């Protein structure tokens, strides 16, 4: 996809691994970076996303679905989950556009990731769009702890999985209360979702600290993103 910012950027898609406590692959999040036409500048999605039009967000979401279609047998064969971030602007389109809905619904292993800044998230199941999405697709709250939402939507059972925010984790990791605080979160949230995951695992030392705390899966710089051509290497380790 080509995005028109200060100059033209094109999207490049990668797969970000999610591992279990034994460092075995359980799923992959499809992420995008944006590169200038000359390749000299690259930006992550979080910097570009606020400047994308609804049409550009739609094109990026469709581009991710198209990539997922090319490697769906890999996900099925290895029993992996795929996560795609769902921008708020695309939520209603997904429910109203039958073709887009069908393209997403055909993948039984696909789960949609929603950020804490999703409009009306604090309404929980009273948010009609969010409730309808949860009826049709497994949802993941992608950055719990970012400080932009309450726990209502989690306790309302709208999310199959919850991922703790990487910045939240890395800030807390510097405190001596990290382990008991994480135990408290696990105890509070686990009964309201199928899987509680943790991001921000950038080192072996951090993985060793987090692994015994009761999380079901882990994501971070310890397992860098890979292009589609290197997917097979993730299951050969």
Swiss-Prot record:
The protein in question is named: Anti-FlhC(2)FlhD(4) factor YdiV
Does the UniProt entry include the keyword Transcription regulation? yes
Subunit and interaction comment: Interacts with FlhD in the FlhC(2)FlhD(4) heterohexamer, inhibiting its ability to activate transcription.
Protein family per UniProt: Belongs to the YdiV family.
A Pfam family (short name) is EAL
| Signal peptide positions on this chain | none
Q: Which residues cross the membrane?
A: none
Q: What InterPro entries is this protein classified in?
A: EAL_dom, EAL_sf
Q: What does this protein do?
A: Acts as an anti-FlhC(2)FlhD(4) factor by binding to FlhD, decreasing its ability to bind DNA, and thus negatively regulates expression of flagellar class II operons, decreasing motility in nutrient-poor medium. Required for resistance to host phagocyte oxidase.
- Describe the location of the EAL domain by residue ranges: 1-237
Xref: SUPFAM superfamilies: EAL domain-like
* UniProt entry keywords in alphabetical sequence: Repressor, Transcription, Transcription regulation, Virulence
What is the primary gene name for this protein?
Answer: ydiV
